[in-house]
Amino acid sequence: MSIDLSDLSDLTSKFSARNYAPLPVVVASAEGAWVTDVDGRRYLDMLAAYSALNFGHRHPRLIAATIRQLERVTLVSRAFDHDQFGPFCAELADLADMDMVLPMNTGAEAVETSIKVARKWGYTVRGVPVDQALIMVFGGNFHGRTTTIVSFSDDPDAHDEFGPYTPGFISVPYGDLTAVSDVFGGPLGSRVVAVLVEPIQGEAGVIVPPAGFLAGVRSLCTANGALMIADEIQSGLGRTGYTFACQAEDVVPDAYLLGKALGGGIMPVSAMVSSRDVLGVLRPGQHGSTFGGNPLACAIAREVIAMLRDGSYQRRSAALGTVMLDRLSALPTAVVSDVHGRGLWAGVTFRLAPGRAVCEALAREGVLAKETHGSTIRLAPPLIITEEELDWGLSRIESVAAEL
């Protein structure tokens, strides 16, 4: 029995909690950089599930890896080992030039994991008094929507009316090295065990920090004996033209937090990747996940890692990203107030229309994007997009901008 668009929308409205306000597109199938709705209309996906689809929809290599594993075993709890787990951990550690991996499922779980690990490291390695550890975060951050994470968010939608809030965090302005230094040099500085930072703030509108900021954070963390934890859940795995966005400043953090693209757009796969000194503080029973590191997730993630090995996706992101950012930067300044991004990742802030209206207009033109923070839209095309497809999408964006 077929169900038409209005019926599907009615079912969503009636039975789904209203924690999302989706654009009026109901996807039925997808391949590569394109999705098709229930009425057979095609759209160029220039959002790629916030970087979860770096390799596009249903990439043949990832589908093949999934099918191979589906035919063998999909889940065993961490009470037992399996033949995909060790190789996955070794290969991801090697890709990140780190020692150890702690796999989870969602990005928020990886962030929560890092908070627990940083605190325990602070107590057992640094000697910070128990229950006194602090973690420095940044204004405009987005690290997830769990209770602890929203406690240090300054986004009213994410934060307000979800208290009481988890203590133990200090927030400073993003990109402000002086503020970071002042915290370390102030009365609470000796309690700061980690700095949690997005190399580029995605949810905030793809905000790129000032040149030298990440290197400065790295230097201050080293000087003050604190961990630098890089949340690369959106920015990592090729999105910015590098395997990791931190590499743009030759910065190596103490830990990477990875997710989204690590699951190939098929499974939720996330991980904290760090040194033995850091992850080695955990003992059996102190952290875990029934599904984290399951055979199917590991098999898919191993194929993702293999696809990133030769750097071709990273180079493609850098090259096509230059084209995209150049075209977007040429949009009329009377219409667009700011364009920012790196690689195939951009935020475009409009003067004359809310971001939602722009995204609805783009959807009518066959392009999928998503608004954030009022008048900004986010663009994150899959890294497999062709030059012709990118040109087609950018032409539609230019057309919509011209009509505003």
Where in the sequence are the language-model features?
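Conserved N-terminal phosphate-binding loop of PLP-dependent enzymes in the Aspartate aminotransferase
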Residues: 1-404
